[in-house]
Amino acid sequence: MESVSCSAAPVRSGDMESQRDMSLVPERLQRREQERQLEVERRKQKRQNQEVEKENSHFFAATFARERAAVEELLERAESVERLEEAASRLQGLQKLINDSVFFLAAYDLRQGQEALARLQAALAERRRELQPKKRFAFKTRGKDAASCTKVDAAPGIPPAVESIQDSPLPKKAEGDLGSSWLCGFSNLESQVLEKRASELHQRDVLLTELSNCTVRLYGNPNTLRLTKAHSCKLLCGPVSTSVFLEDCSDCVLAVACQQLRIHSTKDTRIFLQVTSRAIVEDCSGIQFAPYTWSYPEIDKDFESSGLDRSKNNWNDVDDFNWLARDMASPNWCILPEEERNIQWD
């Protein structure tokens, strides 16, 4: 009686590969279908985002035009301080509208809005000057009282400057400015402690230029801030309603809060930043970023006045115009290590 063999015939390697290929077909098809669905979803989301941005842009244009017309009418017919304060309040609303719209507005529309706002702010300042009572002419003798006017008055809770200061002459116009004269600031100073208070800074354009080994404290809410040709300086500034410009600086430490930060031709500088849009660097090296940590009495009030959203901070969202590679980090800037962020500001 012959025995029946139960052993299976040997399987050739070619047959195994064929079976493996067959088993992978459904998986490949499934993956391809998933990728197709993801692409469809991405396109759908992109269309929705474009529609939302378009609607937001239309809303911005209509709201801005309406509020601008209201402010212009208030300024044209303003015959009292109350009317001017209403115009100032509406301008703060316009500033907040611009700040909230910076992510979806085209660069041209954003620039047009900022320039229109700057013109309205200048017109408001002019109307305030016109409505101020005329001072009667009288001869005055210069004495101790006049000399003492150059000293910095210390605000409650804020340490005074080490030495009294006097505003140094400033250029009437800075190259590449935003179309308005620089109204206050410091220039051509070395190894000094310099301060300005909220009453001096409110919605004004500040220029700091050619400073060396200086500490500058700006307690308040400027409109714009420009720091140029500074070396080994420490700059502490309250919330800036629009932009901060930094150019030709080295070995500095800054604490600034703003809508946008632009840095040009600067090296070896640490920046403690609060920014609602983003920072832009160009022709720079050795720039380090960390979150904004400076504080002082009344800073909450200044943030409210500036129109900046304090809960929004893109301090580490930096564009380097000299580094276009998306898959590699720029060598020109970096995040300041946490162990190096403990700075005694005052």
Swiss-Prot record:
**Domain called C-CAP/cofactor C-like: residue spans:** 171-323
Keywords on this record?
Acetylation, Chaperone, Cytoplasm, Phosphoprotein
User: Where's it found, cell-wise?
Assistant: Cytoplasm
Query: Which PROSITE patterns does the record match to this protein?
Result: C_CAP_COFACTOR_C
Q: Which InterPro entries match?
A: C-CAP_CF_C-like, CAP/MinC_C, CARP_motif, TBCC, TBCC_N, TBCC_N_sf, Tubulin-bd_cofactor_C_dom
Q: Does the keyword field hold Chaperone? A: yes
Listed GO biological process terms = post-chaperonin tubulin folding pathway; tubulin complex assembly
Q: Where is this region: Disordered?
A: 1-54
Cysteine pairs forming cystine bridges in this chain are none
List residues, modification Phosphoserine. 80, 168
Q: Which residues carry this modification: N-acetylmethionine?
A: 1
Q: Which GO terms describe its molecular function?
A: GTPase activity; tubulin binding
In this record, what's one Pfam family?
TBCC
Q: Quaternary arrangement and interactors, per the entry?
A: Supercomplex made of cofactors A to E. Cofactors A and D function by capturing and stabilizing tubulin in a quasi-native conformation. Cofactor E binds to the cofactor D-tubulin complex; interaction with cofactor C then causes the release of tubulin polypeptides that are committed to the native state.
Q: What is this protein called?
A: Tubulin-specific chaperone C
User: Which species is this UniProt entry from?
Assistant: Pongo abelii
What taxonomic lineage is listed for the species of origin? Eukaryota, Metazoa, Chordata, Craniata, Vertebrata
Q: Which gene encodes it?
A: TBCC
